[in-house]
Every structure is written in structure tokens, then in C-alpha cells.
């Protein structure tokens, strides 16, 4: 061995490699041209012997200055065209040299865009990618961790020993390593040594697949290997604004909609049973449905109900079922509880085939403190703020993203693009927007920091939301972006170029609270609370509102919708039908949570599934029939959706009959002759000849009655419709003399002929 190449720095570098403190392994490892000869240095912990195979010759590598650092001299430049034979513990195996691949994976333009916060496809560079480099297949790893002292790939490939595969630090805090010996399905993590010497094992923030809980490693997975057949759907979606169409959303949690017996195993395509993922301790012997099973069972169910969209509570990978998915650790991976990314793609694909859009809950407001996640990622507060007064939700036990950091915003904005591009989703609902907008959200005085202007607005979060929505609609003009924003923050659904946040829909939390408060009141006392029903119209046109009865209203002791209602069972059913019908006739898009469509009795519990056995009883079938028919009516009557955000589409007839708790109003399309008359009676009293003024004489067909026998009601009504009478009331010369069933909503449509 030539002594001149055995310098002291080699020993020093080898010690750093052993101690996982080397951020520049390419400086010493791989092929080097030194003193007119080609030298290959190989780092092989625990190896007994190392040889180099090159051009049908074998060259023994000698240990130099360290027992695990081996060196061989080759007669010419080997490039990548050599293999390493390793004898370890009596077993020999052959592999390619990871450190023979020296080219940068993340180019200058990529780094620049990422540092700016404008790399909208950063997932195509970050994370683990199956590629072919110099005719050799393998996995390219790339991660951002500027403050780390060293990073290694750990996994089954090296017995989870970080001494084997140190990564190369590049410009911009990027770390890279090509692993020719790894393949699809391999599990891995990043072992990060901090400047203080602490070691963290982190899952891949950009990982496309992760292990099933309670394990939390990342899994190498192909990205673009799915054949979509929804091009017509996507083209139609992006050709026009979706908010001017009927939108009726079924919000649901995949893990608690329906469970299956563990005895009934899901079979893979090859006939092998898949290992079941237990559902919960509440029902021993049950398991979660897989994405393919949900494709076969959920999609036909939602289609039969007539909903236009499914909204999925978060399916990004999360470690704890009890978080409902809102504490995300795997932002770029559909949870593996239900199957593979491609199986989820097929779920979306099938939804589109059946005319159903898919909305995902997206959680850019906070993240959990799990050790394998983003928290203190490289030994510093990389993704979160360092000061807990702005970087932590103590009540939730989660951390807040540092939106002022370009790379963090890039991580989130690209994640938004990722779900639309890679999984063809149609919309997002952004969770807990208010917690992002206000620095003092759920914080007492002294535990928050004012902004640069002395206010409580989180200016950085505002800019992030504006950027996210701007980029989203730039790429996907037909997308839905829905804000769960519970305050009166202005211009939530106004365009960003007008100073708005850029969403195109906002949950109407005020309507929801008012209506639930109202319907929980004994009907005899509702006359004193009429304003709760009518107030929403006074602000209805300040935003593009979506009416939502969500999961948040059926947990934590709040009871499910049916059991919020006062009175005996008959009144509970009737009140529920009346509320749902009123919701479908009120301006705004619609969302209800699973179980409401058939009158679930128990509170929602993430560990359980729905009370499907209730459908054996007629009143529950009746509520389901009501939802089915409301969705058909809703889609067939443009007056119920076409002018949701235009005052032209709504007009009170009478909202002041407090003593009877009756309200009446009209909905209309652009054609002024297309009026729908809606009359709601929110007491158990029946009115036999209640007069309602209408703008045009003629016959008004009763097109819906929530008291119909098909829905479990008393079947009181108007025998199919009513002819107007000449009677001056409500500022109209014509009137309808109607029978108003108890606790009901009736809908009438003017027809020129009977």
C-alpha cells in the first residue's frame, strides 16, 4: 500500500465516520485520483474482509488507519463500474458503492426555488426516489436539515445502524445519498445527529408511504405508477368554477364508518390474506376496511344517497387514532392503515367514475411532538417557532409551523399541490384556520407575542394561506378550498389580489351554532328565539358560505344530531327532518357528518363504527330516505344552489311570525319565474289554513314535504299542491292557503299549469 495516501486526515475522517459525525463522506469515500493512481475507499462497519470487483478482476481492499475503512488501488478510473464484496460474520454479499455516485441530485435551480419557497413540486426531489443512476437501480435520498451535524440512512439494509450509510451535505442544508442496494418496500429512517451530539431517528417528512401504527418508519414507494381514467372528470372540473354548482358533501372518517370481522380477511390479488389492522378495543375481533373494500362499499352508498362529494377527515399518515387524523406526521403519504397509495388512488379514480368528488381535510396549522416527526427535526426548531408563545398550542399539545421560513411554507404549499396532482383530489377543507390567524388563539394574556404592528394577527400565517390558495388555483382552477374559520375575520373567501385569504368557501359556523341552539329548545319556547333562525341571512352574502353539521358537533358530550332534539322520539325524528330540510333550502353549500343521514343515536366515537343496525327501524329509514330525496331535489332545482352567493337568489316572505314559529321565504334561479316557496313550521302545531303571500298567481306544486310518510312523518300535506287565492298578505296580491304539518318544512314550485 502506498504510504503517501495514508495521511492523518484519513484517520480523523474515519473516526468521524465511526462516531456519525461526518457531513462530507465523499471527501474520503468512493473513487479518488491520488498521486497518479485511482484509489477506492470503502467504509464497512463490522466487515472482516472487503474486495473490489472491477472488469473481471478482484482487488483486495486493505484496512487503513481504521479497522472499518478499506482501500484498494485500481489501474484506471472505475467510475461506477465496480462492485464491493463484503465478508461479514462468515457471510459474503456483493453490493454497489453508494459513494461512487457523486453528482448532485438537487440542482441549483431546485435549491433556489426551494429557498424562495416557490418549488411547487419539491416532493419530486425531496424524500426517497426509485431511480436508475449510471445504469444502476436504487434509491436516491434527499432531505433538508441545515442544522444537523450528520445524517445517516438507517433501515433493514444496515440493521438500523447509523454508522453504515452517512449522507452527503450539499448547499442549502440539503443532504443526499444514492443507495444502489435499496429497492421498493424497504423501510428506512433518517438518523440525525445534532450539533449537541443527540441522535434522533426521524421518519421522512416527504415519505410517500409509512409503516402501519404503532411502527413509524418510512417505506420506499414508487410515485408515478398508476393509470388514471378520469381525464374527462378533471377537465370538466377545471373548466369552470365549482362553487356555482350544487355541492352536497358527506363528511366521514374512514376508520369508523364500518368495521369488518377479523375472520373475514381481505385477499390480495395473489390470493394471500392481508394482515388485518385492528379497529379498536371497543369491538374485539374487528378490523378496519381497506381502501379497496371502501371503494366497493362506501362509493355505492354515497352515490345512492345522492351526495356530490365525499369529505375525508385527514388521511395523511398519523400515529394516533384518537387524534382523528389531525396530528399528522406523514404529510405526503395516505395512511397505510387502509392500504397502499395506489389503492387510495383507485378509490379516488372510482369516485370520479361514479360522479363523486373527493375533498380532504388538510391540517397546515399545527403538528404533533412525536419524536419521529417534524418536531426539533435537526436539533433545532426547524419547522416550528422556537418561542412557545408563538410556536406551540399548549391546549392541544402540538407545535405551530414557522410560516416565516420559506422552506417551511414550501413544504406545505407543495404538499397541497401534491395531493391534487398525485391523487387527483378535488378539494380541501383547511382545519382550524382561526388558530392560524390569531397569535392569541386560546392563549391568556402574557402567553402570546404581538405582531410587528402590536396586533394579534399572525401576519406570516395570513401570507401563507394567501400563497397556498393562489398556487392551488393557479394549478387547479376548479378546486374547492374550504376554510373552517370560526371568527369574523373578513374576506376569507375573497381573492388574494383583493386582500382576501383566497378560499372559495367558508364553513358557516354562526349558522350551525344558531340552528343547533334553536332546535335544542322546546318548540313551545322557540317563539322567543326566532332571531336564531333568521339572523344568518343578514350576513349570508359577506362570504361564500357552506352550511356544515360536522363531526365536531357530535362528540365530547354534545350528543348526535337526533339526540340534540327535544321531546319524545316522534318529535326528535320530526325535528331532525325539519332541520335537515331547512338546511337544504337555506343559501349555502351543504355538509353533514356520517350517521346524520339515518339518525345515528350514539355520539360519534373514533374507535367504533356507525349504528347500521338502526336502519332496521322505519324512522331511521325515513331520515335516510329524506336525505336521498333532498339531494335529488337539490341537484334538480337550480334555484336551490345557483345563486347561493347572490342576494337575488333569496327573499323573505315572512320571518316575523314568532308566535307560531313559522318562517317562509323564496329561492330563485336567474329566471324570475323559477321561484321556490319554502314554508317551515318549527312547532308541533298543525295549521290547516295558513296563508303565505306569493308573487305570482297560479298553481304551486308541493315538491317536498318533510312530514311525508316516506320519511316517517304523519303524511299531512296539501294534496300535491295549491292554487293561489286573491288575498293581500306579505305585500303580495296572491296567497297560498296551506296546511302546515307539525315540525316540518314544505317546498312549493310555481307552475303555469296545474
Curated annotation (Swiss-Prot):
SMART domains according to UniProt: Aamy
Record pathway: Glycan biosynthesis; glycogen biosynthesis
Organism: Prochlorococcus marinus (strain AS9601)
Role: Catalyzes the formation of the alpha-1,6-glucosidic linkages in glycogen by scission of a 1,4-alpha-linked oligosaccharide from growing alpha-1,4-glucan chains and the subsequent attachment of the oligosaccharide to the alpha-1,6 position.
Xref: NCBIfam families: branching_enzym, PRK05402.1, PRK12313.1
Class of this enzyme: transferase
Listed EC numbers: 2.4.1.18
Domain of life of the organism encoding this protein: Bacteria
Record CDD domains: AmyAc_Glg_BE, E_set_GBE_prok_N
Keywords from the named record: Carbohydrate metabolism, Glycogen biosynthesis, Glycogen metabolism, Glycosyltransferase, Transferase
Catalyzed reactions: Transfers a segment of a (1->4)-alpha-D-glucan chain to a primary hydroxy group in a similar glucan chain
Subunit-structure text: Monomer.
InterPro entries named among the record's database cross-references: A-amylase/branching_C (IPR006048), Branching_enzy (IPR037439), GlgB (IPR006407), GlgB_N (IPR054169), GlgB_N_E_set_prok (IPR044143), Glyco_hydro_13_cat_dom (IPR006047), Glyco_hydro_13_N (IPR004193), Glyco_hydro_b (IPR013780)
A GO term for molecular function: cation binding
Pfam families membership: Alpha-amylase, Alpha-amylase_C, CBM_48, GlgB_N
Positions annotated as active site in the UniProt record: 431 (nucleophile), 484 (proton donor)
GO cellular component, one term: cytosol
Family recorded in the similarity comment: Belongs to the glycosyl hydrolase 13 family. GlgB subfamily.
Membrane-spanning intervals of the chain: none
Protein name: 1,4-alpha-glucan branching enzyme GlgB
Any one GO biological process: glycogen biosynthetic process
Annotated coiled-coil segments of the chain: none
